[in-house]
């Protein structure tokens, strides 16, 4: 008996960027990339944005193939919005600690304890959690959406407790919070940010609302990645301490080459960066290979897709 040998794979092209552009034309593909992706991936993307912007692009694209340079729940959202399109994710292992912190069975049991509550879920969650939700939000529109909901309507906010607390502070609404968090944003160190402020006394601290309250209290500005990017561009300040995943610094520096952007460090003294290990699983090589091989593909059962679609559509309508 002889083992079946795998067919040899063709070598990688010397110019990956040119090869990706050729495949994009061949497939009629669009490359969507999150701000937290590696700069090399951002530079070949057709659109770079935050979760809200990427959702809008996914909903409106005329491309036949969506190549999502991000994490799994983002590619899932693109598939939910585009069931007839081929949606590719360079690395299926690119998950999300926040999405993983909210298992569907545990959340369903949690939701059952509050039968009169509406569920507003942060888009950083699985399709199963979206299907259990009444409306989806992003960090860009969470405050705006909660402000539009009936003031006497009880709410559950999931899965990010830090974003939920921020939304409660901004709106004055009490909400029942699921105790989830992002491993990147919860590990920023208040002490080390204060040390940076002492070193750069004229710098402004700009932070993502997924951070802990102890960190946010030192921020001059709090907002989504797009809001942070816009603020750094328009604010009359030369130096910013950026308290979110450092992939965003690539776009900040491109738009503001004369300004200085300092990535906030985590608590761990051995590292001065706080990169998302899941976002960084995607590489230029994997991007090329997923387009060449038309896989990994994102697939969802139709009943789950339809259930998850409704709260996403509500979000887009209210945004």
Swiss-Prot record:
The keyword Ribonucleoprotein does not apply. [4Fe-4S] cluster binds at residues 96, 182, 276. InterPro entries: NadA (IPR003473), NadA_sf (IPR036094), Quinolinate_synth_type2 (IPR023066). Binds 1 [4Fe-4S] cluster per subunit. Keywords: 4Fe-4S, Cytoplasm, Iron, Iron-sulfur, Metal-binding, Pyridine nucleotide biosynthesis, Transferase. Belongs to the quinolinate synthase family. Type 2 subfamily. This is Quinolinate synthase. It comes from Thermosynechococcus vestitus (strain NIES-2133 / IAM M-273 / BP-1).
């Amino acid at each position: 008996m002889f083992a079946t040998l795998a067919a040899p794979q063709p070598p990688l092209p010397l110019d990956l960027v040119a090869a990706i552009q050729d495949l994009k034309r061949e497939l009629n593909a669009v490359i969507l990339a999150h701000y937290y992706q590696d700069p090399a991936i951002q530079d070949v993307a057709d659109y770079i944005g935050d979760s809200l912007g990427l959702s809008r692009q996914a909903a409106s694209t005329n491309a036949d193939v969506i190549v999502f340079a991000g994490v799994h729940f983002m590619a899932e959202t693109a598939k939910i919005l585009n069931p007839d399109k081929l949606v590719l994710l360079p690395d299926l292992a690119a998950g999300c600690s926040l999405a993983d912190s909210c298992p569907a069975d545990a959340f369903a049991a949690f939701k059952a304890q509050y039968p009169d509550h509406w569920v507003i879920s942060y888009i950083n969650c699985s399709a199963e959690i979206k299907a259990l939700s009444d409306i989806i939000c992003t960090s860009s529109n969470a405050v705006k959406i909660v402000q539009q909901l009936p003031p006497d309507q009880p709410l559950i906010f999931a899965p990010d407790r830090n974003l939920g607390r921020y939304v409660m502070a901004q709106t004055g609404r009490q909400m029942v919070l699921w105790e989830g968090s992002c491993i990147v944003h919860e590990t920023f160190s208040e002490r080390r940010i204060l040390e940076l402020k002492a070193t750069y006394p004229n710098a402004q601290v700009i932070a993502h609302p997924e951070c802990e309250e102890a960190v946010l209290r030192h921020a001059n500005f709090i907002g989504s990645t797009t809001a942070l990017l816009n603020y750094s561009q328009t604010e009359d300040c030369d130096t910013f301490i950026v308290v979110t995943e450092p992939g965003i610094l690539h776009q900040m520096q491109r738009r503001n080459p004369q300004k200085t952007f300092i990535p906030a460090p985590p608590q761990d003294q051995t590292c001065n960066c706080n990169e998302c290990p899941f976002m960084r699983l995607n590489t230029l090589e994997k991007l090329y290979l997923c387009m060449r091989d038309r896989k990994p593909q994102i697939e969802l059962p139709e009943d789950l897709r339809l259930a998850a679609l409704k709260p996403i559509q509500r979000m887009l309508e209210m945004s």
